[in-house]
Amino acid sequence: MWNYSLTVEEVALVCQVGYERQAEMFGQPERNVNYYEGDHWEMLQHTICAGSELAFARMIGIKEFTPHVNKFKTELDVDGFEVRYTFPQGCNAPCCASESSRGRLRMTRRDDDDQIYVLLGGGLAIRTKMETPPYTMPPYVALGWAYGHECKKPEFIYNATTWYVPRADLHPMDTLDLSNVQGMRQLL
């Protein structure tokens, strides 16, 4: 119930979104807010995260959804939710987060305390060889959720502007209220 494998058409869509999210930064490493890993890795990271947004929309029954290009958090990732992604253990590509942050929901001081944040893992960060149709992608998995204010506790502080919430401290997905989601189907 709380996992979804993108179709090959959906992968093509999130690749386009990943490109568009990074395009305005091409060749300008000084514009990155945190640090710069190279446009190719930044674009891949945007692609993987756009995939997590699309997968979550499908998990909650939203069929008509395209991840937006807006990276400045003036729009929610999915109707009513912010989606965060955690890279899998053992991922050593430059676009993967540090080992200490894996399996955790990342929050910054810019994040809304009243918003719901959902953590996903898996998906396109897992390299696989697809040889025959239907070319099944590794599934994205919803790992848990929390309100922003629940994440900004002293025990989760990483540095002056960031918190990392362990998966064990997130609410189980089956407790997520989906009653206000437009286009939502009944989850069985």
Describe these PLM feature segments.
Residues 1-77, 84-188:
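Nucleic-acid endonuclease domains
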